[in-house]
A protein has these predicted regions:
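Sequence signature of WD/YWTD-type beta-propeller architectures
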Residues: 1-196
Length: 196
């Protein structure tokens, strides 16, 4: 659809679409044919809906996020019963298993390619989630929020992070300067993202 909401057109079924950095492709969680798992994996298509193909080695994958160079995709899969994060080259090769980090989902790759945001309830026995950041190799995990937060997204310049808690908030990449964004009349907001 257009930025103003007009000219909506269905391209395919699926969840959590993510634009490629060059704007030519969309990665998404493709629906499965069996409710267990409900998602068959990560697929990629051209922006007009053509060229749909499944990325090998992404079984049960969801929440895809492109690397800034468009060569890799970070995602999570719940096939093992835990939300395990992975990185794969777009042709399905070079799968990196980040299970050593622990559970995580709702990944978002930083514009400089050096960090990945993710959501986890690893530090909460009552299962609410917070936002964390790590390097693409799974090292340097740091918790950024402490009062429940989800759906993080980097700003295009990498200077800010937007997230829900449950309304939209913004903070610096080091978790500084947290502030609520005003959305009068909108109600509860989730899945915030940036636009250029």
């Amino acid at each position: 659809m257009n930025a103003n909401g007009t000219s909506q057109r269905r391209l395919t079924g699926g969840l959590s679409p993510a634009w490629s950095p060059d704007g030519s492709s969309i990665a998404y969680a493709s629906p499965g044919h069996d409710p267990n798992p409900p998602l068959s994996g990560i697929s990629i298509m051209n922006v007009d809906g053509s060229g749909q193909h499944r990325v090998p080695n992404t079984d049960g994958g969801e929440y895809p996020s492109w690397s800034p160079d468009g060569k890799r995709i970070a995602f999570n899969s719940n096939l093992s019963g835990d939300h395990v994060m992975y990185i794969v080259i777009v042709d399905g090769s070079g799968l990196v298993d980040l299970s050593s980090v622990g559970e995580g989902w709702q990944v978002d790759w930083s514009p400089d390619g050096r960090s990945i945001l993710f959501t986890s309830h690893r530090d909460h026995p009552d299962n609410y989630t917070d936002v964390y950041v790590m390097r693409p190799d799974g090292s340097g995990v740091k918790r950024l929020t402490h009062d429940g937060a989800y759906t993080p997204a980097w700003s295009p310049d990498g200077d800010h992070i937007v997230f829900s808690a449950p309304g939209p908030f913004i903070m610096g990449p080091d978790a500084s300067d947290v502030s609520a964004l005003s959305t009068p009349g909108v109600g509860e907001t989730s899945l915030p993202d940036w636009t250029d």
